[in-house]
Structures are given as structure tokens and as C-alpha cells.
Amino acid sequence: MTLQLPNDPARSDVLSARPTLWINSLYRDDAIGDTCLPLVPDQVDVAQSDWERLAPLLETCFPELKKTAGAIRSDLTELHALREALGYGGGEFGRVFAKADSALPVAGSIKARGGVYEVFVFAEELARREGLIGDREDIRHLASAEARAFFSSYSIAVGSTGNLGLSVGVAARALGFEATVHMSSDAKPWKVERLRKLGVKVVQHEADYTTAVENARSAAEDDPAVYFVDDEQSRRLFLGYSVAASELVDQLQTFGVAVDADRPLFLYLPCGIGGAPGGVTYGAKKVFGDNAHCFFVEPVQSPCALVHMMSGSEELVSVYDVGLTNSTEADGMAVARMSAFVATVMRNMLAGVFTVDDASLFRWLLLAHEVQGLRLEPSAAAGFAGPGFIVKHPQGRAFCERLKLSDRLRQATHVVWTTGGSFVPQEQFDQFLEIAQASRSR
């Protein structure tokens, strides 16, 4: 189908695949309180309780979690030097931080928050339903030989461009499940190889992410022994991500950062299908209220959330419908059509979306490594454009004027969510750096 986007200041840039900022005209206060939404804020608290209950089991399955007592957490780092290198040294940029999910244990990306959560919650649910574990029994029994033998007769399936597949595959194999990951043509070879070394069956499709998910769903739906992790519709994935915002509250307090009407918080979240950034946004709105303003960031050729939300269509819109290619080196964001579930939840909750080109991703990846010592994959560097768009772009300035934030930007906090990279093999990371250095020397 061919789609005509409505008249909007960002329209021309979007259609021409130029970096731009789109502001959501439907963004409003207290959107999380909308009773028509398909979930309620209390479900974030339930997810937090799930994580705490599962922590002893996670620590048993993953020795790297011993130092956090089974919690999957990432550091918050203030970017003193990198902000200067990025051109954000002026006082009008407030304080700039990175939330380093790029170094999350277990799976090395933000997808550990969703994929591990869903697999482990399902495992507990299945074990209790089948009488493998009682209400008062130690949750660590699910890591026993008996439990592994039980789980081995079940399989977990998922469709992925890479990082969600890694997260689900690692979690499933840790408990003894069989696992199948359907991967799109955008998936990086090293991610495929890593999964296969874990004993995960990888089915590669010569098609995009949406097709890989559809094939995974179709293959799973007729087999009662297969549990499908549905990246397009899963509440569990979404809620697993949402708990990250509570983690951020404590970390900001450690830096002496308060978030209130006079000290706004801006979050910049790389977006593929939308589950991870949508979950973090929902959690942020729960804990910070209307003082948090969340922006998705997408590649110029794959802005699926921007295109759909700008269109105002009740039907899902694809980037192909507006003549874009869905071609990008940011494999985790190479998604043509956003999640309908996430689109519904974000309708009034998301402040906006900005887009970036691949050359900028590599430039920021190199700067982050040289100046801050961060190890990122291209998609994880996307959020670094955020402060510039808010403070300098005409639409960013208009947004701040409309919300009466312009005079408060010096007290603002910007958090760039770096979403993956620590598991990238050294050879592949060196190639990223070479691409960036070659571009710099031109």
C-alpha cells in the first residue's frame, strides 16, 4: 500500500530519509492514567516483585549475577568528557548521562530485561502448574537436574533481528528448554553463531524482521509444547523492560539528581518494534510522572514508530508504505512495522521520535569508545542525538516552549539509553571502528 503522510514539519525530512525530529501532537499529561489502555501501572509493581522472587534462581543460573544477588542491572554514567565531544558542553544542555544497558549481564543488551524475564516467568508458571514446585519450595529448584529434564520436553520460540533472540536463547538454554530463534536477513552472523554454540536452533529467513516473527508464530502455534515469545504483542516482555525505570530512580538520586517540574528528565530510547523503549517509557511515566519526557530514536530508513504515529492510521503502517527501504547497519532497529500493542500504549505517552543516519551512528560509536570507553554496537549509539534535537532543533525548541520547559533546560537531565554492544566480538567491534575512522578521514 502507498500512504500519504499528513502535513507536518517533519514530513519532508522523513520522506527524504533525512535526520529529523517529530513531535507527537497527542502527547498529554497523565497519559498513563488512561483507563482504556490494555494494562495498568500496578502491573509494573508485579513485574518488580517477579524479578525479586526470581533473583535467587537467576543467580544460580548465571554466576555473573552473584555480585548483584541475581539482579540484572546496568550502570548510570555521567558523560562529562563525551558531552563536550558531542557538542553538548554548554550549560543549556543540563546534565547528560548514559544508561549502559549495552553492558547488561547475561545477554549484553536491553533485551535481557524483557527476554530473560519472560522466559523465567513462563518457566515458573509452567513448573507450578505441573506440580514441579510447590508454593513454599525454593525457587532454585528450577535449576535442578530434575527441572532441566522436565523443561527439556518444551521449546521456546522467538523471531528476532538478533538481540532478543540472544536474550531468549540464553535464558531458555540456562533452564534446559529447547530453543528456536527465527532470524531476519538483517541479523549479524556473530549473533547467529553465538546462539548455535549455546545449542539454540537458528532458522534464518531471507526476509525482514516482520516476516521472521510471522514465521516463528506460525511454526509455534500448532504445537502445545512450544511457547512463543511474541515481540509484537507480549505484555510480559513490555513489563520486564518497564522495571528499569525504578532502577534509574535510585541511580539518579546517587548523583544528586532530582526530577520534578523545575528539573525535567529527557530519555532517549533506540526503537525497533517498540517493546523495549515502550516498556521503559511506561515505567518512567509511572515513577517520574509528567516530569519525564521520552523520545524514541530510529534510523532514517526504518522509522516505523514515527511513520505509524505520524500517520494517525488505525491500521499499522510500514516504512515501505512511504517509500523507505528499511535498510540500516543498526540491525536491532531494522523493523518496518511497529507493534500495535506498543502503538496503542504510546499514543498519548510518547513525546516524539527523532531519526538518525548510519554515518552518525558510527561517528558516535567511535567517540563513545575513544572518549568515554564505551563499547557499543551502532544501534546503541542512536540516542546521542537527543540533547541536540531538544535544545537546538526548531521542533525541539517549540516543544520546550509549549511545555514551558525552555527556562528549565539548564536544570534538566538527559539520559541516553545505550542498548547493546558488550557481547560484540572484538573482530566485529574493530570493523565498526574502522568504518567510523574511514568516514572521519574523508
Curated annotation (Swiss-Prot):
Modified residues (N6-(pyridoxal phosphate)lysine): 111
NCBIfam families: D_Ser_am_lyase (TIGR02035), PRK02991.1 (NF002823)
Presence of the UniProt keyword Metal-binding in the record: no
Organism: Sinorhizobium medicae (strain WSM419)
Protein name per Swiss-Prot or TrEMBL: Probable D-serine dehydratase
EC number: 4.3.1.18
Gene Ontology molecular-function annotations: D-serine ammonia-lyase activity; hydro-lyase activity; pyridoxal phosphate binding
Reactions listed under catalytic activity: D-serine = pyruvate + NH4(+)
